[in-house]
Amino acid sequence: MRHMPTITEVMTAFPVHVEESTPLAEALDLMKEHQCHHLPVMGGKQVVGLLSGEDIKLAQSPGHEDQDFEELVAGDLCRRRFAKVDLHTRLDIVLTGMGEEGLNAVIVMKNEKLAGILTTHDACRFFSRWLKKEYLPDDDPGIA
């Protein structure tokens, strides 16, 4: 029987995160610096929200109700309703749930503490590696 990959093999462990009071411009700079699209938002030691690059882009768009982008902080725009899963949840269950709910990220918790984040980007990278391993010979010149 083959091994079911665990969420820990796919997720981004110890993700970059921000406090609720972090200015959006700073959050956007962190996303660029770390090449990520989602940031867990913390209120002390608790995850209180999830901020995405799309949320920030929307706030920067003309006609957005919050016109003064420079005054906004992560807590103003983060989604307060977000999916979180336990570190020991099977990967297939998490991915199925993400697909059914149309989620592009879930927060991964261990003992009520932030342990990681699993995004569609993480899943695609993992699946790509798996496909190459399963279906391409080791001597394939197309493998980088």
Which residue stretches match the model-derived regions?
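Tandem CBS (Bateman) regulatory domains
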Residues: 1-14, 52-84, 88-99, 114, ...
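The conserved cystathionine-beta-synthase
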Residues: 17-35, 42, 84-102, 108-110, ...
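A glycine-centered beta-loop-beta connector
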Residues: 31-34, 39-55, 98, 106-122
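C-terminal basic regulatory modules in eukaryotic proteins
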Residues: 73, 104-105
